[in-house]
Regions:
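Short, acidic loop-to-helix structural element flanking the phosphoryl-transfer center
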Residues: 43-53
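Conserved acidic
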Residues: 23, 46, 167, 171
Length: 182
């Protein structure tokens, strides 16, 4: 019942006098609440399309920068273990070189916690010019979401403000798990 009561989670703020136990509860409760909110907002039709595109691809590349790069590395590891040719690229020059070698049988998964990194948006445009499919994981209404063939939009809400980087990364990784096991 507590998981269903969103007010329970959003009312927490970190207080300097919080004990470690209270702080732990606040971080976990906020993270759980936000993950459940994100799950309920996912577009199932787009998830189906993304899973289908990945299943039919000859090669998958995961593109990301900065804090999104560990999510891309985790994704590449999951797909590699499924014996699917995949790579993770966080270097911009390598991304552009790779983009020029892609074709209609390939998929790029572009991962961005902001959706505004111009270098990633530019790379996605190049990938699309070679007819490869681009699946994006990013916030809604961002430049990246507008450039992807399949935009899996992930909006981490205000309730996650006390631990947004953790919550965001866990949400992205959970969606990668859905894509991998789908």
């Amino acid at each position: 019942q507590q998981l269903a009561a969103d007010e329970y989670f959003t009312s927490y703020e970190i207080d300097p006098n919080d004990s470690i136990q209270v702080l732990t509860e606040k971080v976990f409760d906020t993270t759980i609440s936000e993950i459940l909110n994100i799950r309920s907002q996912l577009n199932q039709e787009l998830l189906d399309q993304a899973i289908e595109a990945l299943a039919n691809s000859k090669r998958i590349e995961f593109f990301a920068f900065g804090g999104s790069a560990p999510v891309a590395m985790d994704a590449q590891h999951k797909f590699f273990r499924l014996k699917i040719p995949s790579s993770c690229i966080s270097d911009q020059h390598i991304k552009f070189m790779s983009a020029n070698s892609l074709n209609k049988d390939d998929v790029v998964v572009a991962i961005s916690h902001s959706g505004t990194t111009s270098a990633l948006v530019d790379t996605v445009k190049t990938v699309r010019s070679f007819n490869a499919c681009v699946i994006g994981l990013m916030p809604s209404g961002t430049p990246l979401s507008k450039e992807c063939d399949i935009s899996l939009e992930i909006d981490v809400g205000d309730s996650a403000r006390l631990n947004s980087p953790i919550t965001s990364r866990l949400a992205y990784m959970a969606i990668i798990d859905v894509l991998a096991v789908g």
